[in-house]
C-alpha cells in the first residue's frame, strides 16, 4: 500500500504530539493506537471518547483509515480530534502502512 518509512516520518510530524503507537503506550491528548486495526471506533481501553466516536461503529482498517485521515471531522462529526486531515492520498497511504506495522 504505502511506504512505511515515509509514513513514520509523517506520524512523527503530524500525529505523535497526540498519539503513541507502542504496546502499553500512554494515552496523550489522543488515544494510544496499539491494536488499532480490526478494532471498532472508540474502543481503546482507558481513553475518554466522545459519544460520536463510540457510536460510529466502524472497524478500523486500511479503507476506513484512508477516509478518516483525509478529513476526521467529516468522517466522524463530533470527534475531538482537532487535526484537519491529510489531503494527499500518497501521504495517507504511507501513514496507514506505518500504522499497520507499528500498532500490531
UniProtKB/Swiss-Prot annotation:
Q: Which GO terms describe its molecular function?
A: electron transfer activity; heme binding; metal ion binding
Which positions are tagged coiled coil?
none
Main location per UniProt? mitochondrion
Localization recorded for this chain is: Mitochondrion intermembrane space
Q: Which domain of life is it from?
A: Eukaryota
Which Pfam families does the protein's record reference? Answer: Cytochrom_C (PF00034)
Tell me where in this chain the PTM N-acetylglycine is found. 2
The similarity comment for this entry is: Belongs to the cytochrome c family.
Job of this protein = Electron carrier protein. The oxidized form of the cytochrome c heme group can accept an electron from the heme group of the cytochrome c1 subunit of cytochrome reductase. Cytochrome c then transfers this electron to the cytochrome oxidase complex, the final protein carrier in the mitochondrial electron-transport chain.
Q: What is this protein called?
A: Cytochrome c
Organism of origin is Katsuwonus pelamis (Skipjack tuna)
Amino acid at each position: 500500500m504505502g511506504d512505511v518509512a515515509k509514513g513514520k516520518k509523517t506520524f512523527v510530524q503530524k500525529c505523535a504530539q497526540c498519539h503513541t503507537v507502542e504496546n502499553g503506550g500512554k494515552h496523550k491528548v489522543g488515544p494510544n493506537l496499539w491494536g488499532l486495526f480490526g478494532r471498532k471506533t472508540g474502543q481503546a481501553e482507558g481513553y475518554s471518547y466522545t459519544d460520536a466516536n463510540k457510536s460510529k461503529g466502524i472497524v478500523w482498517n486500511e479503507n476506513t483509515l484512508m477516509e478518516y485521515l483525509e478529513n476526521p471531522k467529516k468522517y466522524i462529526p463530533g470527534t475531538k480530534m482537532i487535526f484537519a486531515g491529510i489531503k494527499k492520498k500518497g501521504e495517507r497511504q504511507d501513514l496507514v502502512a506505518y500504522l499497520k506495522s507499528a500498532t500490531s
